[in-house]
């Protein structure tokens, strides 16, 4: 039954007294309490708060997806104005009616793209299916529109990507596919749950601008769920701050940033890492720990030098990793993705080397190739003086005790059938390191170190938020006391306060045990805080590498400068340069089979600071 007289003028969505709970061991656990808000047509409402504060379950409740997961939802009012201007009460819609509402009138970009995309269908089919269902388009028309949407979200070789499967794409590319799918039907309301978490800063800037452009064209209301206050400052009109399932403050973006009233809001803003905060400092520095009771910043002491002189613990020389692309009636390999091309670097005990670059630049593939999770076609990988790229699988398994990996997608890397205690204890069992009671005590200690409770060991992955699942993955990686940890976007899914705690934990472990980190990230403020050295990757090659201070304070390569310039700043009044969308052809690392790409030539421009000389392929970086 329509409720056209109950929506205020200009509103496209209105929620009153939303309560969400889950049953656990015959006990009702409240996740959201008495939440009320509205969204105007053409407005962006940012919902911010810590991991587990109720942001994502609120979004799932609006999409009517919680009932299937056992969620108990009660609400006085949940009104939506559809694209046809009809106003409906979402809580009264049947499952069949909601299938027509989702996608056409309300769309959602989910936090974890690997678990949101169907692994058995090509991404082009998945985007086209939504277009066919909601726009009555033919298959051919839908595929043309799907290709156009992939172009819009800055995916190179979009025509090729249409026929690829989710597991064949990087995390950032999967996230862009999700964004393309959500925007393809031009909904009245877009709910974006951490949509730029897996994206590098340059693509993030493009996506934020794309959302704003489409929002203006369609007068689309946007609910933007994020923990990145820089993104909030850039995109939001109003901000809703949530803490422990309740709204503690709401107001315009200027009010929240310049005159926050609630202690938690002030603490949240104080914990935001600022690019440039490490200027003049040579070594990594702990994040200030911010509490609700004491939101004032207390600068911690500078970290002492942890890098051990002598031989590197890990040495990589001319690493090459390529993936075949098949085509034609005979399904022959005709082209290859040059994911990693002649990459070389050293990693010393106690050092953090950060790999930064765009999604698809080869960062994650480099990390996976070091553990032989993907096979390389050339180069040498030497760990503690021993070549590991030629080891047998049996010897390689023993070596993995000393090199651990923290994956980008926490839900996909945890077994949904195992409790998280079993997931953390599994490496200890595989390597036969600790008996039962000692292993259980180790699990409890690890959970506490990453900000969780020992009793959480009996829960399953689906019972945690995205940020909490990432903490579980970090605890699992730390279980074996490894010498090297490869952290692939290990803190990208965490809110600012927990992110600071995890970075401080990693620094403490590095100081105490001499762990070396290969830190793969697109968060330049975090990279600046944790790194000893930084390597910038572009199209599978390192184009700049050197001490963190030199790279951040005196970037030499135009791509490095572009990365730093694209970092969002937590200041809503700051003027941002307008970026031209799709102003040029996107470069690609896909080449004909057998075609060799010239390796960039690195030149020394300072102590330990090497830069590739700009070539024609970097011309697209002009501002």
From Swiss-Prot:
Keyword presence, Transmembrane helix: no
Binding site for ATP: 49-56, 357-364
EC numbers: 7.4.2.10
Entry GO CC: plasma membrane
Enzyme class (EC, first level): translocase
Entry's Gene Ontology BP terms: peptide transport; transmembrane transport
Subunit details: The complex is composed of two ATP-binding proteins (GsiA), two transmembrane proteins (GsiC and GsiD) and a solute-binding protein (GsiB).
Homology family: Belongs to the ABC transporter superfamily. Glutathione importer (TC 3.A.1.5.11) family.
Official protein name in the record: Glutathione import ATP-binding protein GsiA
Source species: Escherichia coli O6:H1 (strain CFT073 / ATCC 700928 / UPEC)
């Amino acid at each position: 039954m329509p409720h056209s007289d109950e929506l205020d003028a200009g509103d496209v969505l209105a929620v009153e007294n939303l309560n969400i709970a889950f049953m656990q061991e015959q006990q009702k656990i409240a996740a959201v309490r008495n939440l009320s808000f509205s969204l105007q047509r053409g407005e962006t409402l940012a919902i911010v708060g810590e991991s587990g504060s109720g942001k994502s379950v609120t979004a799932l409740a609006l999409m009517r997806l919680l009932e299937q997961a056992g969620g108990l939802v009660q609400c006085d009012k949940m009104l939506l104005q559809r694209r046809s201007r009809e106003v409906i009460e979402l809580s009264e819609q049947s499952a069949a009616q909601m299938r027509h509402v989702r996608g056409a009138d309300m769309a959602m970009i989910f936090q974890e793209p690997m678990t949101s995309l169907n692994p058995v269908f090509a991404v082009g089919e998945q985007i086209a299916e939504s277009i066919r269902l909601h726009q009555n388009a033919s298959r051919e028309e839908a595929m043309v529109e799907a290709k156009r949407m992939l172009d819009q979200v800055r995916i190179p070789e979009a025509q090729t990507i249409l026929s690829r499967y989710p597991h064949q794409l990087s995390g950032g590319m999967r996230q862009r596919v999700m964004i393309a799918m959500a925007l393809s039907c031009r909904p009245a309301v877009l709910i974006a749950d951490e949509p730029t978490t897996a994206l590098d800063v340059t693509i993030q800037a493009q996506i934020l601008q794309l959302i704003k452009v489409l929002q203006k064209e369609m007068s689309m209301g946007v609910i933007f769920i994020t923990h990145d206050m820089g993104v909030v400052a850039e995109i939001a009109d109003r901000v809703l701050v949530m803490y422990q399932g309740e709204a503690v403050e709401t107001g315009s973006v200027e009010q929240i940033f310049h005159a926050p009233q609630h202690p938690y809001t002030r603490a949240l803003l104080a914990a935001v890492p600022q690019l440039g905060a490490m200027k003049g400092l040579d070594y990594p520095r702990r994040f200030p720990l911010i509490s609700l009771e004491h939101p004032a910043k207390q600068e911690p002491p500078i970290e002492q030098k942890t890098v051990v002189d002598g031989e590197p613990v890990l040495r990589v020389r001319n690493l090459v990793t390529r993936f075949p692309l098949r085509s034609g009636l005979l399904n022959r390999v005709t082209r290859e993705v040059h994911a990693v091309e002649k990459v070389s670097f050293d990693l010393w005990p106690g050092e953090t080397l950060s790999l930064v670059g765009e999604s698809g630049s080869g960062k994650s593939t480099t990390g996976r190739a070091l553990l032989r999770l993907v096979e390389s076609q050339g180069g040498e990988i030497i760990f503690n003086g021993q070549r590991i790229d030629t080891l047998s699988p049996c010897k390689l398994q023993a070596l993995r005790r000393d090199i651990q990996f923290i994956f980008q997608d926490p839900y996909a890397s945890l077994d949904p059938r195992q409790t998280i205690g079993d997931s953390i204890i599994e490496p200890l069992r595989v390597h036969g390191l600790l008996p039962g009671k000692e292993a259980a005590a180790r699990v409890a200690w690890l959970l506490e170190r990453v900000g969780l409770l020992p009793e959480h060991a009996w829960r399953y992955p689906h019972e945690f938020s995205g940020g909490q699942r990432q903490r579980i993955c970090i605890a699992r990686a730390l279980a074996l006391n490894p010498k090297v940890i490869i952290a692939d976007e290990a803190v990208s899914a965490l809110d600012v306060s927990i992110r600071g705690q995890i970075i401080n934990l990693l620094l403490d472990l590095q100081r105490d045990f001499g762990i070396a980190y290969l830190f793969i990230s697109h968060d330049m403020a975090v990279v600046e805080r944790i790194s000893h050295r930084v390597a910038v990757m572009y199209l599978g090659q390192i184009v700049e590498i050197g001490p963190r201070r030199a790279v951040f304070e005196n970037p030499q390569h135009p791509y490095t400068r572009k990365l730093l310039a694209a970092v969002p700043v937590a200041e809503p009044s700051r003027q941002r340069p307008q970026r031209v969308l799709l102003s040029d052809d996107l470069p690609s690392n896909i080449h004909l089979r057998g075609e060799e790409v010239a390796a960039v030539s690195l030149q020394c421009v300072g102590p330990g600071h090497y830069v590739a000389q700009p070539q024609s392929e970097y011309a697209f970086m002009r501002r």
